Amino acid sequence: MMDTKTKLLGLIGHPVDHSFSPIMHNTAIEDLGINYVYLAFDVSEENLKNVVSGAKALQITGFNVTIPHKINIMKYLDEIDEDAKAIGAVNTVKIENGKAIGYNTDGIGAKRTLEEKAGILIDKNILIIGSGGASRAVCFELAKDNNLTIINRNIEKAKILSEEFSKKLKKQKPINYGDLDLDIKNFDIILNTTPVGMHPNTNVDPVIPLKNIKKDAVVMDLIYNPIEPVFLKEAIKYGAKTINGLGMLVYQGAVSFEIWTGMKPDIYVMKKAINSKIRL
């Protein structure tokens, strides 16, 4: 039960009504028996600055940042973790000693989720679709030990991101880039980081056709609502192993939770909470 000592955590983005983060985090909070609550807030771009100053004034413990604010939130923060700074996007903010500090846990979440189905990720040929905030985090984490290609509807954005991370990570083999017509037959892993197919706009075509994928390819979509987005339905038709965004949501959320509270939540409890929501 909330009282005057309850600490507030939250999620900001637009939209947020589809999010499973509140039930996931609140279940973890209840499991640990700590006095916190996690709420979702639909925030427009013009109110981002006010959100950060308000969070500091109200002594909110911290909040997650989702689409479309992961990049623009950075200019309103007091400090940014070195990895988040290199990524160029923030998905987690902690308010500490009156300062808003930004972190990024998306890349770690994506990597841990992929490794559950694809094994250790070393020297894999990976195709990343999209160049937004989530893409930046995933690229930064996966490019360290693998061969990446980034594609985007706007090829110039893909080029800028590939060149930026090739330089930051001192890649001997530069990150490749292309447009949405790139031949996909040689990729071990294909990962969609765009919101194409996300609730409520689910009646759309897949972001790229998948008929030429490798026989044993792993296809991941960061979308988790719907559970089986159109991109994964397409992948299943061609025999691919598929992963939706639920695992990443849990793993990145667990790292965020630890940043805020100093406590490790139970991953199983968080997954179970989401699965119970899905069945409703």
From Swiss-Prot:
Keywords: Amino-acid biosynthesis, Aromatic amino acid biosynthesis, NADP, Oxidoreductase
Biological process annotations from GO: amino acid biosynthetic process; aromatic amino acid family biosynthetic process; chorismate biosynthetic process; shikimate metabolic process
Domain of life according to the entry: Archaea
Active site annotation, chain numbering: 70 (proton acceptor)
Amino acids binding shikimate: 19-21, 66, 91, 106, 224
UniProt-recorded Gene Ontology molecular function terms: NADP binding; shikimate 3-dehydrogenase (NADP+) activity
Binding site for NADP(+): 82, 130-134, 222, 245
Coiled coil location: none
Catalyses which reaction(s): shikimate + NADP(+) = 3-dehydroshikimate + NADPH + H(+)
UniProt keyword Coiled coil, yes or no: no
Disulfide bonds: none
Keyword NADP set for record: yes
Gene3D superfamilies: Leucine Dehydrogenase, chain A, domain 1, NAD(P)-binding Rossmann-like Domain
EC number: 1.1.1.25
Pathway stated in the Swiss-Prot or TrEMBL entry: Metabolic intermediate biosynthesis; chorismate biosynthesis; chorismate from D-erythrose 4-phosphate and phosphoenolpyruvate: step 4/7
The family this protein is said to belong to: Belongs to the shikimate dehydrogenase family.
Role of this protein: Involved in the biosynthesis of the chorismate, which leads to the biosynthesis of aromatic amino acids. Catalyzes the reversible NADPH linked reduction of 3-dehydroshikimate (DHSA) to yield shikimate (SA).
Assembly behavior: Homodimer.
NCBIfam families membership: aroE, PRK00258.2-2, PRK00258.3-3
Protein name as catalogued: Shikimate dehydrogenase (NADP(+))
Gene: aroE
